[in-house]
Amino acid sequence: MKVSLQQRVLFSGLLICAPTHSAELSGFAGLGASVRPIYSGSNHMAVEPLLNAGVNLHSENWGLFGLSTDGLIWGLTPDSPFSVSLLLTQDEARKEVFNYSFSGKKNRDLQGMGDLSAALMAGTDLRYQQEHWMLWLRLLTATEKQRYGGDAPGRSLIVTSGAETELWRWQSVALSVGGDISWANSGYQQRHYGVTAQQAQRTDFAVYSPSSGFQQGGLYAEVVWHLDKNLAAGLTSRAQYLFDEAGSSPLVNSRMQYTLSSLIQYTF
């Protein structure tokens, strides 16, 4: 997920406001690869590079500020089991012609739909965390309306809740499993799964206007191996199912979506 210059400037302003005499600065950087569908609902998979990096500022008076490749986070109560965070992130862009990273191949399944630009999303994250498990709820909404396919649907809104637990740990290796489910409004569904009249004229897809409803449910498993106190390697597998309106879209070739990703991360 890309981070815009606007987000970096905002984070810099927060750093200036934080009392540096009581703050701790840390960071992380990771590199890996993932195998995943080329877009939500596609039955074609692609190998893509993964880059994960960021910095965190932990202040006694202001909480936790984080800037990463996932966006911005302000954790208001980072040291308690129940935490509340404010988020600024992106709903990823989608190209009508997909270029495979490690070959000259192209996928033209969505040609004629037009490129879907990234959307800035703001929201909040609530979670309750104990030593070996956690529950969480996240709400994100687009900061502005966005035209796509000749129409301007309402602002995207998506609510996701989930749970995760650590099943097994041996020395420096841990196995965790989790699940989540998402509900999305019609604006989000139209953005990702809808087909406007203008798009239908340029493609073989029928006009489709999905309504609000459950968007997806997923299960995942993750193995993390701490090589030393600063270096860790992880492997994550995920399976998710597109529900109702999302899964019925003419853009969707497969309701079941699978992802496998690996990452080596260094913290400092």
Language-model region placement:
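Short glycine/proline- and aromatic-enriched beta-strand/turn motifs that initiate or cap beta-hairpins
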Residues: A23-L67, L72, R94
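Residues that define the transmembrane beta-barrel architecture of outer-membrane proteins
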Residues: L25, M45-L51, L116-A122, E131, ...
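Repeated loop/turn-to-beta-strand initiation elements of outer-membrane beta-barrel proteins
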Residues: G27, E60-L64, F82, H132-L135, ...
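Transmembrane beta-strands of outer-membrane beta-barrel proteins
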Residues: F28-S34, F65-S68, S85-T89, W136-L140, ...
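Residues on the lipid-exposed face of transmembrane beta-strands in outer-membrane beta-barrel proteins
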Residues: L31-V35, L51-L57, G71-L76, A122-Q130, ...
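Transmembrane beta-strands of outer-membrane beta-barrel pores
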Residues: A33-Y39, L57-S59, L88-R94, Q130-H132, ...
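Outer-membrane pore/translocation modules
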Residues: T69-E164, W168-Q171, Y188-S211
